[in-house]
A protein has these predicted regions:
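Alpha-helical transmembrane bundles and membrane-interface segments of multipass inner-membrane proteins
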Residues: 1-185
Length: 185
């Protein structure tokens, strides 16, 4: 039972979007900061537990990125609705996730069952998204966070989102090309 702890943590992170969205809707940015911080730390914790104790499961390989995407998209949607993040950034994040989803479905339907394989640039993008979310929330809570840090975070998230999209498409297109033209098939 304890070997499923990382999966439970991922599920809780996904569910954390409900109180987080409510807090953001109420402009309770300080409270939202701490909920987001816990959710961000839970992403590190579930991955560490799974790898450290060998509790990696096929379900966890799917739950973790789904929880991450749900968390990031809901948070940036609420930030955009509250005027704290640009709408174009939300749409860029959604476009990246749509590309990943469609690519995953295409791979699964046309080539082979898909094994979730996070890329380093994808992990960096998620880290920057969570960090930027925390910086935006700290700024909105009127803590001593300069607006320039918010702007830098938004720029870094945008760059990482585009770069990781290109990286995923390039990587999986190359794998698909090799698989399609492999002499063994």
């Amino acid at each position: 039972m304890i070997r499923h702890l990382p999966n439970a943590i991922s599920v809780l992170r996904g569910l954390s979007v409900v109180p987080l969205a409510v807090l953001l809707a109420l402009d309770a940015y300080a409270y939202a900061f701490f909920v987001a911080l816990l959710a961000g730390l839970s992403d590190l914790l579930d991955g560490w537990l799974a790898k450290r104790f060998g509790w990696v499961t096929p379900a966890g390989a799917w739950l973790d990125p789904i929880a991450d995407k749900l968390f990031v998209v809901v948070c940036f949607a609420m930030l955009a609705l509250n005027g704290l993040a640009p709408h174009w950034l939300l749409w860029l994040i959604i476009a990246r996730d749509a590309i990943l989803l469609l690519g995953s479905l295409a791979w699964h339907w046309f080539l082979a069952p898909l094994e979730v394989q996070p890329r380093r640039l994808g992990k960096l993008t998620t880290f920057l998204e969570v960090l930027t979310l925390l910086v935006v929330l700290a700024n909105a809570a009127n803590w001593d966070v300069a607006l320039v840090y918010v702007q830098i975070g938004i720029a870094l998230v945008a760059l990482a989102t585009v770069a990781s999209s290109i990286d995923y498409v390039w990587h999986w297109a190359y794998k698909a090309h090799r698989k399609k033209w492999s002499p063994s098939e």
